């Protein structure tokens, strides 16, 4: 097995683990919303999980590249120049899905849970729209809704100074419902963000390795000596 095949196999196993993690993490808030909410249209904690960043972005869109990468370990029909090229091509889909998962997670972390929303816990701010994702402002990404002592939407802070931000930072505990919502929202979407980042790195590396494997070739089966 060449270096390209070994790295491709490692990428396949890594992507498989990340797919499972992304799907499970995304399903946790969905399950809670189905159990606690009277209807499935609103979640008392959040609503960004209904954009399915872990199920679609980090899950379904990474399956083709994962399948092709794992096939390299078996030295089957996929273990040739064409197979390596396809693994590189399918990894582009993985990269797109990982970016989608990251953008949704960043948007969710920017807005905070519904209990921190100033519009009476409305789901309007997280209505599905690619335009909303394109409006992400890195400068407003400060997580004040999580680290501040009180749950206030980041948009309610006007030009906060660094000293004020540091002095008001406080890790929420689970003593109140508000803090539990903040901790749960932060944990879920920070985890999905990390899954998306890792999938992006593995996807980019597989694009490079698959391209090199396509150019340099792969190992052949040794003929059995009878």
Curated annotation (Swiss-Prot):
GO CC annotation, single: plasma membrane
Paired cysteines (S-S): none
Cytoplasmic membrane side: 36-49, 105-191
InterPro entries assigned to the protein according to its UniProt record, in alphabetical order: L6_membrane
Keyword Transmembrane: yes
Site-annotated residues for Cleavage: 13-14
Modification after translation, per record: Glycosylated at Asn-132, Asn-148 and Asn-163 in presence of ceramide which inverts the orientation of TM4SF20 in membranes exposing these residues to the endoplasmic reticulum lumen. Cleaved by signal peptidase at Ser-14 but the peptide does not act as a signal peptide. Cleavage is inhibited by ceramide which inverts the orientation of TM4SF20 in membranes exposing the N-terminus to the cytosol and not to the endoplasmic reticulum lumen.
Domain notes: The first transmembrane helix plays a critical role for the insertion orientation in the endoplasmic reticulum membrane.
Protein's name in the database: Transmembrane 4 L6 family member 20
Species assigned in the record: Mus musculus
Gene it is expressed from: Tm4sf20
């Amino acid at each position: 097995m060449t270096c390209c095949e070994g790295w491709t196999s490692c990428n396949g196993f890594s992507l498989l683990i990340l797919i499972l993690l992304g799907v499970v993490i995304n399903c946790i808030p969905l399950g809670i919303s189905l159990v606690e909410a009277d209807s499935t249209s609103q979640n008392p904690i959040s609503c960004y999980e209904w954009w399915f960043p872990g199920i679609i972005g980090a899950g379904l869109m990474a399956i083709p590249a994962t399948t092709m990468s794992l096939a390299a370990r078996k030295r089957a029909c996929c273990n040739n120049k064409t197979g390596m090229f396809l693994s590189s091509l399918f990894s582009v889909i993985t990269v797109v899905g990982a970016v989608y998962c990251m953008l949704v997670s960043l948007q969710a972390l920017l807005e905070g849970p519904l209990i921190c929303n100033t519009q009476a816990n409305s789901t309007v701010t997280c209505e599905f729209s690619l335009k909303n994702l394109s409006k992400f402002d890195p400068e407003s990404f400060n997580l004040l809704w999580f680290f501040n002592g009180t749950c206030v939407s980041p948009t309610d802070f006007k030009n906060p100074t660094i000293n004020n931000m540091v002095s008001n930072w406080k890790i929420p505990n689970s003593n109140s419902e508000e803090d539990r919502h903040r901790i749960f929202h932060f944990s879920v979407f920070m985890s999905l963000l990390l899954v998306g980042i890792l999938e992006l790195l593995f996807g980019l590396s597989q694009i490079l390795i698959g391209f090199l494997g396509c150019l340099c070739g792969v190992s052949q089966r040794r003929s059995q000596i009878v």
